[in-house]
Amino acid sequence: MKHNEVFGWTLKVLSFLLVVIPANALDKHGWRKQSIYSLLTDRFASTNPKPCNPEDREYCGGNWRGIIDKLDYIQGMGFTAIWISPIIKNIEGRTKYGEAYHGYWPQDLYTLNPHFGTEQDLIDLADALHDRGMYLMVDTVVNHMGSSDPRNIDYGIYRPFNQSSHYHPMCPIEQDKPLSLEQCWIGTEDMTLPDIDTENPQIIETLYNFIHDQVKQFKIDGLRVDATKHVRRTFWPGFCESAGVYCQGEEWTGQADLFCEWQEYMDGLHNFPVQGVAAESVIPLNDRALRKTAIAMNLVAHHCKDSTLLGLFLESQDAPRLAALNNDYTVLKNAMTLNLMSDGIPIVFYGQEQMFNGSHDPVNRPALWDQGYNTDGPLYQYTSKVNKIRRDLINSEDGEIYIRSITHAIMIGDHVMVMYKGPVITFITNYGAVDKEYLIKMPGSETMIDLLTCTLIEVEGEVMRTSIKKGEPKILYPYQLAFRDGFCQEQITLQEIDDVFMGRNEINGPDRK
């Protein structure tokens, strides 16, 4: 069936489908203001914790009740939403790649994963979040089902798509061919994922009704959509409209112009063009990575319809932990600052705040209970501080201007990036604990204050001089606005700049009038 015919059927389905937005659900504008803590349900918290060896690739016992018990830990860092693993029943047993503890090998769309808990457990999790003013984002998989044996697939185990005719014919994916990406099967010769025929009108209707009912039943506020690019683009607007909530899709490409095309079909996307280079910027002696990050941020801002609706992340279950690339705490603080203060909705992966250092799957997916829920750790405390600054900026008198402003990034040398977002100027460095001083020329004469240290930075004439000490990040805000909005109500200090420059650069900032 041709895509235009399928699109026509999609519109017909939607005309008959009653779309009810859940009472607690956020629209895309509400999600723009959130800060998301992403977690693997099986590895974050358990009501019966046991030692977990991630290299075994087995279920370790994490569950929804465990998450409820640890919401104080998440909220203590300032996060306002969580993103949990797919909730539906997956295939059982061991495959060549282990068990389906991650949730991405579905078997039954209408049954919850019993390893994670009951229907009531999931509803209680949603209620517990909403009672705190927090929100629930659920990962969803509708591109494929799971199979442990690609040579002998038993379609009868799947629900509701239990016939081979419900799937595209098996074929290997060719990455440079869009139709192949959409209709061929993800996997290897040892394990493959049967690709659902999302061109079939009856299947479209089934999936749209499924997600509508699931969101309503379990009080879901937003969806993370797996394998977005492996389903034709025109499928997604109807899917998200049926859900009645904000969707954030996985379109894994580093090319900003191609990436941004997808925002015509889904409001939210994981910001892969920025993530790919920003994560590399923590690698020691990687002189060009931070510059590439600034370029990527500006390209995404230019090409995308609205970069403030994207999800900005640096760690994930598919990527090395940042501390595996560099365990310098100062560098990781800067990375967290970038993660939380750039355009879009911040997403922090569980354990990032504890400086997990797994370099690859599966060792980058340990159980948090084995490491401990240390709320006194330096990066946990720092994450809480920056999240609070972001939240206070959003709640300020000019909060809407701030959160909707598009970031413009410029570089000073190879190791300092300056991000301008509305009235906020954020300095990010990646050279570690080294003293340097940078002379920034800016129009106007506003005294600024560093919201991280409550240090005043005076502007003389049209020149602001600010000293970056030991590679520390900075979040600058006009002092008059800070006073009005209640920032830094305790002790304020005046910046001291050494007379001897260990490194000096000059740059003209953009006109911010």
Curated annotation (Swiss-Prot):
The keyword Calcium applies. Its main location: endoplasmic reticulum. GO terms for biological process: carbohydrate catabolic process. GO terms for cellular component: endoplasmic reticulum; external side of plasma membrane. Ca(2+) 2 binds at D226, E250. Its EC number is 3.2.1.1. The active site is at D226, E250. Substrate binds at W105, H144, R224, K229, H230, G254, D318, R365. Coiled coil: none annotated. It is found in: Endoplasmic reticulum. Glycans are attached at N162, N357. InterPro entries: A-amylase-like (IPR013777), A_amylase_C_dom (IPR015340), Glyco_hydro_13_cat_dom (IPR006047), Glyco_hydro_b (IPR013780), Glycoside_hydrolase_SF (IPR017853). It comes from the Eukaryota. Disulfide bonds join C52-C60, C171-C184, C260-C304, C454-C488. The record marks D318 as: Transition state stabilizer. SMART domains: Aamy (SM00642). Ca(2+) 1 binds at N143, E182, D195, H230. GO terms for molecular function: alpha-amylase activity; calcium ion binding. This is Alpha-amylase mde5.
